[in-house]
Amino acid sequence: MTNGNAEVVIVAYKPKPGKESDLLQLTREHLPVLRAEGLATDMPETTLIADGGIIVEVFEWAPGGTERAHQNPAVLALWKRYFEVCDMVKLCDLAEAKQMFASFRRLEF
């Protein structure tokens, strides 16, 4: 069964030099903040790591969550911290994504 109003997103974060541990901490915090604010569903999260320490996060926005996140002070503060420690990269630019069967390592928190 699918939820036609929810949206699954895949985002890739490339850590800035020396900021790998900060990025890991932010990734631990990210989905709990979104859920606490009612912006993400309880779909089990998937967090992966690609070559170069790039973190790939898969989660599901609640209906309207994307739009509401852009007005939410807690989320905006979290995103500000993200931009200090990483660059977001396109999934298609990851070496793994160029393969027929993209393989990543699972990151457990």
Model regions: which residues?
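Short coil/turn motifs at secondary-structure junctions
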Residues: 16-18, 50, 62-64
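Short, surface-exposed ligand-recognition loops at beta-strand->loop->(often short) alpha-helix junctions
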Residues: 14-26
